[in-house]
Amino acid sequence: MARVKRGVIARKRHKKILKLAKGYYGARSRVFRVAKQAVIKAGQYAYRDRRQKKRQFRALWIARINAGARTNGLSYSRLIAGLKKASIEIDRKVLADLAVNEKAAFAAIVEKAKAVLA
């Protein structure tokens, strides 16, 4: 059986990692050993943050809805309770957008929630 030298395979593997590490600072983009660690860590951060992004956006939407609700004389929790009682099914993303960009429409929704709560 012929002896197999791994030069081609090793070069391909190294090129793949260094391509993924392109744009990293210093040795992280040039030295294979360091680049491999950086790419693995970047993958871990990306995996974690894809999940955190959902939580962070929900928190942002809630903060915006709360600010909009309080300008209309209602707290966030009371607004959500009022919307549930009035069977108005608008998700937080849309509510937050209305609170920021369409203040009149948001105020109308808050008034409906207030009417049900009173």
From Swiss-Prot:
GO terms for biological process: ribosomal large subunit assembly; translation. One of its GO terms (cellular component) is ribonucleoprotein complex. The keyword Ribonucleoprotein applies. The keyword Acyltransferase does not apply. It holds the Pfam family Ribosomal_L20. Keywords: Ribonucleoprotein, Ribosomal protein, RNA-binding, rRNA-binding. Signal peptide: none annotated. InterPro entries: Ribosomal_bL20 (IPR005813), RIBOSOMAL_L20_CS (IPR049946), Ribosomal_protein_bL20_C (IPR035566). GO terms for molecular function: rRNA binding; structural constituent of ribosome. Binds directly to 23S ribosomal RNA and is necessary for the in vitro assembly process of the 50S ribosomal subunit. It is not involved in the protein synthesizing functions of that subunit. Belongs to the bacterial ribosomal protein bL20 family. This is Large ribosomal subunit protein bL20. It comes from Pseudomonas putida (strain ATCC 47054 / DSM 6125 / CFBP 8728 / NCIMB 11950 / KT2440). The lineage of its organism: Bacteria, Pseudomonadati, Pseudomonadota, Gammaproteobacteria, Pseudomonadales. The gene is rplT.
